[in-house]
Swiss-Prot record:
It comes from Canis lupus familiaris. Homodimer. It catalyses: a phenol + 3'-phosphoadenylyl sulfate = an aryl sulfate + adenosine 3',5'-bisphosphate + H(+); 17beta-estradiol + 3'-phosphoadenylyl sulfate = 17beta-estradiol 3-sulfate + adenosine 3',5'-bisphosphate + H(+); 4-ethylphenol + 3'-phosphoadenylyl sulfate = 4-ethylphenyl sulfate + adenosine 3',5'-bisphosphate + H(+); 4-nitrophenol + 3'-phosphoadenylyl sulfate = 4-nitrophenyl sulfate + adenosine 3',5'-bisphosphate. Sulfotransferase that utilizes 3'-phospho-5'-adenylyl sulfate (PAPS) as sulfonate donor to catalyze the sulfate conjugation of a wide variety of acceptor molecules bearing a hydroxyl or an amine group. Sulfonation increases the water solubility of most compounds, and therefore their renal excretion, but it can also result in bioactivation to form active metabolites. Displays broad substrate specificity for small phenolic compounds. Plays an important role in the sulfonation of endogenous molecules such as steroid hormones. PANTHER family: SULFOTRANSFERASE SULT. Its EC number is 2.8.2.1. This is Sulfotransferase 1A1. The keyword Cytoplasm applies. Substrate binds at residues 106-108. GO terms for biological process: dopamine catabolic process; steroid metabolic process; sulfation; thyroid hormone metabolic process. The modification Phosphoserine is found at residue 138.
């Protein structure tokens, strides 16, 4: 395999006021030509909110619970990542061109950057939201290991950037709120990571109903088992270990790190938590969303 060019932690690039990984920002121009199909299904999340988990669940549903079919390729090929671009790897759009319908498509884009065709075609969306504290901790470790991001510096300085929306994909607060608003006018199934952790079978049943499919109970149980954190952490078709360490260095931090709710307590100091809570209350006031920060 040819050597992948040095990714060397380029600075974020702003598009319409939203910071993005440099390569992803460059990919947005070609997204203008993207045509959604009515039977596409979009998986949308802010980063580190259970994207790969729900992608694996949906691929299992689309493959009628056939585990072997779900090992046909890495998850980023089975569920193309719309805005993805990185040196030496096919772009998300290139992968999509070879993906047969009905397609599962992943994005982290805020609505301001989402191709209008997805809304025009009334494409169904499964959105997963996770509490901000766990997202911030997970994102910090992801920044450390995924070298397409700038250097995260210290946890304290990263947390400040997260609160200010100065991380890739911008503000968590805006992301979860605007997709919540969209769910009132567009076919969006809005799920919570914490609910999925608490009762995955119940949430998978919600997804099945939303996509208009039914599966035998034993198949649903198999999906619960196959998409458990332990199984996915050991599944090379789901855990991103097939990517070059030039892109993701698992020796720094695993892509599948802990997969729990409430891990923020091991990282936040009392002072950070107080500062975060005060800022959070201002940004989330009156939005109608409430998150559990532990189970």
């Amino acid at each position: 395999m040819e050597d992948i060019p040095d990714t060397s932690r380029p600075p974020l690039k702003y598009v319409k006021g939203i910071p993005l990984i440099k390569y992803f920002a460059e990919a947005l121009e070609s997204l203008q030509d993207f045509q959604a199909q009515p039977d596409d299904l979009l998986i949308s999340t802010y980063p580190k909110s259970g994207t790969t988990w729900v992608s694996e669940i949906l691929d299992m549903i689309y493959q009628d619970g056939d585990v072997e079919k779900c090992r046909r390729a890495p998850v980023f090929i089975r569920v193309p990542f719309l805005e993805f671009k990185a040196p030496g790897i096919p772009t998300g759009l290139e992968v999509l061109k070879d993906t047969p319908a009905p397609r599962l498509i992943k994005t982290h884009l805020p609505l301001a950057l989402l191709p209008q065709t997805l809304l025009d075609q009334k494409v169904k969306v499964v959105y997963v939201a996770r509490n901000a504290k766990d997202v911030a901790v997970s994102y910090y470790h992801f920044y450390r290991m995924a070298k397409v991001h700038p250097d995260p510096d210290t946890w304290d300085s990263f947390l400040e950037k997260f609160m200010a929306g100065e991380v890739s994909y911008g503000s968590w607060y805006q992301h979860v709120q605007e997709w919540w608003e969209l769910s009132h006018t567009h076919p969006v199934l809005y799920l919570f990571y914490e609910d999925m952790k608490e009762n995955p079978k119940r949430e998978i049943q919600k997804i099945l109903k939303f996509v208009g499919r039914s599966l035998p109970e034993e198949t649903v149980d198999l999906i619960v088992q196959h998409t458990s954190f332990k199984e996915m952490k050991n599944n090379s078709m789901a855990n991103y270990t097939t990517l070059s360490p030039d892109i993701m260095d698992h020796s720094i931090s695993a892509f599948m790190r802990k997969g729990i709710s409430g891990d923020w307590k091991t990282t936040f100091t009392v002072a950070q938590n107080e500062r975060f809570d005060a800022d959070y209350a201002k940004k989330m006031e009156g939005c109608g969303l409430s998150f559990r920060t532990q189970l």
